[in-house]
Amino acid sequence: MAKGSLNLQDLFLNQLRKEKVNVTIFLLSGFQLKGVIKGFDNFTLIVETDNNKQQLIYKHAISSIMPSKPINYMAQAQNNQQASQQSNNNQG
């Protein structure tokens, strides 16, 4: 992916992680997990459940993620874009 382009999945997951939003994760098998996203990478999520247990979930097993409240993931995208523009201005 080109530098400066937006990755919606990462913006969304990072905002959920930073705000510690409770989520319901629906797996392809029909199973549901409820908890807070503690971290993620290209292939996995780490979710902490209500009983303080952590689970590593592979993204290919996820159908959808439903936050308990609306997420403003575009605010982070705009902040990233502004920081990138300032960095470019300082270099030139």
Curated annotation (Swiss-Prot):
Biological function: RNA chaperone that binds small regulatory RNA (sRNAs) and mRNAs to facilitate mRNA translational regulation in response to envelope stress, environmental stress and changes in metabolite concentrations. Also binds with high specificity to tRNAs.
Designated name of the protein: RNA-binding protein Hfq
Gene3D superfamilies, sorted: 2.30.30.100
Residue stretches of biased makeup (Low complexity): 75-92
Span of domain Sm: 10-71
InterPro entries per UniProt: Hfq, LSM_dom_sf, Sm
HAMAP family: Hfq
Keywords, alphabetical: RNA-binding, Stress response
Gene Ontology MF term list: RNA binding
Organism: Caldicellulosiruptor bescii (strain ATCC BAA-1888 / DSM 6725 / KCTC 15123 / Z-1320)
Highest taxon listed in the record's lineage: Bacteria
Region (Disordered) location: 73-92
Family: Belongs to the Hfq family.
Record's subunit section: Homohexamer.
Gene Ontology cellular-component terms listed: cytosol
GO BP annotations, alphabetical order: regulation of DNA-templated transcription; regulation of RNA stability; regulation of translation, ncRNA-mediated
